[in-house]
From Swiss-Prot:
Residues 45-137 are annotated as: Disordered. Residues 48-70 have a biased composition (Basic residues). GO terms for biological process: filamentous growth; negative regulation of translation; positive regulation of cytoplasmic mRNA processing body assembly; positive regulation of translation. Keywords: Cytoplasm, Initiation factor, Phosphoprotein, Protein biosynthesis, Protein synthesis inhibitor, Translation regulation. Belongs to the CAF20 family. This is Cap-associated protein CAF20. The lineage of its organism: Eukaryota, Fungi, Dikarya, Ascomycota, Saccharomycotina. Pfam families: CAF20. One of its GO terms (cellular component) is cytoplasm. Residues 93-108 have a biased composition (Low complexity). It comes from the Eukaryota. Residues 118-128 have a biased composition (Polar residues). One of its GO terms (molecular function) is translation initiation factor activity.
Length: 154
C-alpha cells in the first residue's frame, strides 16, 4: 500500500489522475486486526463493568402484579369477594365441615410495625414569637359567662 506524506498530498492536484495500486489483501488484514483489537477492548470493558448498574435504572417503578379477588355467589344470590391466596385454598380443601373451617386460622398473622418519625422535620429550633401567637388569637370570641350574667339580670 502506498503511503503519502502531508507535503506530497498538498503538492498533488485533483485534476491529475493517479495510478491506482491498491493492495486488497493488506487492507483486509489491517481491518481484521482493528476488529480483533476492538473485540478485545470490549471484552475487557465488559469484564470490569458488565455488572455495574446504570444510574438511570432507579427512575422506573417496579411492576407489581395484583391478583384479582374471586367472586363467590351464594345460593341466595349474594356475591362476595374472597382474595385468592395459596394458604387459603389449602385450608379450605383440607377442612370438609364448616365448623372445622371456622376454627382454622385463615390468612397470615398481622405484624406490628413501629414507625419512627423524622423529628428533624417536625420540631423547630427557633422559639415562637409572642407577636405570632397574638396574631393567631381570635379577636372576637364568645364569652359564655358574660351571656349567662346577662340572662340573670333580665
Amino acid at each position: 500500500m502506498i503511503k503519502y506524506s502531508i507535503d506530497e498530498l498538498i503538492q498533488l492536484k485533483p485534476s491529475e489522475t493517479l495510478k491506482v495500486s491498491f493492495d486488497h489483501v493488506e487492507f483486509r488484514n489491517i481491518i481484521e486486526k482493528v476488529v480483533e483489537l476492538q473485540k478485545l477492548k470490549e471484552e475487557e470493558f465488559h469484564s470490569h463493568h458488565g455488572n455495574r448498574r446504570r444510574s438511570s435504572h432507579h427512575h422506573m417503578k417496579p411492576k407489581i402484579k395484583h391478583n384479582k379477588p374471586k367472586v363467590k355467589t351464594d345460593a341466595d344470590g349474594w356475591s362476595t369477594l374472597e382474595p385468592a391466596t395459596a394458604g387459603h385454598e389449602e385450608e379450605s380443601s383440607s377442612s370438609a365441615t364448616p365448623a372445622a373451617a371456622a376454627t382454622t386460622k385463615t390468612g397470615a398473622p398481622q405484624e406490628t410495625i413501629r414507625v419512627k418519625p423524622n423529628n428533624k422535620n417536625i420540631s423547630s429550633s427557633r422559639p415562637a414569637d409572642n407577636s405570632d401567637i397574638i396574631a393567631d388569637k381570635q379577636t372576637h370570641g364568645f364569652n359564655a359567662f358574660a351571656a349567662l350574667e346577662d340572662e340573670e339580670d333580665e
